[in-house]
Amino acid sequence: MTTESNSESNSESNTGPIKPTTTQTGTPVASDEHSLTVGTDGVAALHDRYLVEKLAQFNRERIPERIVHAKGGGAHGVFEVTGDVSAYTRAAVFQPGTSTETLQRFSSVAGEQGSPDTWRDVRGFSVKFYTTEGNYDIVGNNTPVFFIRDGIKFPDFIHSQKRLPGSGLRDATMQWDFWTLSPESAHQVTYLMGDRGLPRSWREMPGFGSHTYQWINAAGERFWVKYHFASNQGNVEMEGSEAELIAGADADYYRRDLHDAIEAGNFPSWTVSVQIMPYEDAKTYRFNPFDLTKVWPHADYPLIEVGVHTLNRNPQNFFAEIEQAAFSPANFVPGIAASPDKMLMARIFSYPDAARYRVGTNYAELPVNAPHAAPVNNYSQDGAGRHHFNAPEAPNYAPNSLGGPVADPLLAGEGSWENDGELLRAAAVLRSEDSDFGQAGTLYRDVFDDAAKARFLDTITGAISGVQRPEVTERAIWYWTSVDATLGAALRANLATWAEADMLAEASAQYSE
């Protein structure tokens, strides 16, 4: 096709005047289709700066994918306060009548960028609130617990869930080897292997902050808090066979579902509630309330409604607004703080550090990550990609006598808690109900109905049947027996039946040959 005919086609398809193609520096270019060559069949000229620019830019279009939660999607929205929790926190975002712009990202945990959305996995559920006091992020999942309780194990856990370094293949043996040697994982693995591991869509699943956080009210009183996001579309799951079919037919099934729903005006929403624990209760509660592998019973700490979170706008550019988005549990606002949760402590460091590596030193200046309703005043400067800077006469150090920003000493004690003891490496002191398997057993026996239990048994049998080391298989049977004795016995019988069927199939195949 000639340049002229291509121009006519463009003219017909655009409503406004045709804009000339330019280089990155704004100068017009001669052709989008032909390199500068010595004759029509000759070599390309190195001084064809537009060719060089296009190829160089193309080579750099991708940034490192997230080491976890790589595959995902998201949208913009609004959070509206419908309840009154001002007695517990002074955070502006949670005051009655407040409306706050938000960004949400959903994701899977273990899969890479191109992995199918419907693989069995925990789903990420992260919300950024652009509050008048700065950005506040809740970086959670669609389950209220996690696989481990100490961040020092996180790299090992993720390695075990991804791929073998030799073959580059995912491996059931190393997954179950890690899980069964880390019994604190039992509660989360029960969620994962149950129906919660295969939601129908991101719209039809709940979300949780998972960690315990601290709220501080206007009087300085402290409380411990957990976040819950209940889907107003209901919680809907899919069968394993259906998930496998969809994985082969549409790897972007969840991403497409969310985009199409919002595009059609079918805005998904979640009712946001919290559990509140009085500060002093944590010292004597029957299990460690900061343990990320445990839930707080609603009978002890009932849900209190805070507001409604609605997604109502798709990104205009997926890369700029979703892929470059950086969420961090370190992003607190006045009235909200951390807790002694060891996993939370590790994530407070690792998330912004990952963003600096993945997006760049000045990732927080990008529009999607910068505050939308609060000013930024600090003394940071320079670094790759720096866009914003202070006035030339402004000081770049503190303290100064030139009218630069001044820290607020009244915030110094906010978010604190009392602790003592020697510096050591050890697990938390066990309390009366600090069992790794107790809540997993309760979930299986009291929450799963008979049909869900049957599906669960089939799922773990299939997953464990791929284990190649007998000692890991035996340990997996012990693991589930510790969750529930009846379940463990059924699993052993199921595995024996599956193994016998495999042997018969193998013998039949050999006989046929």
Residue ranges and their predicted role:
Residues 2-513:
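Active-site-adjacent core segments of small-molecule enzymes
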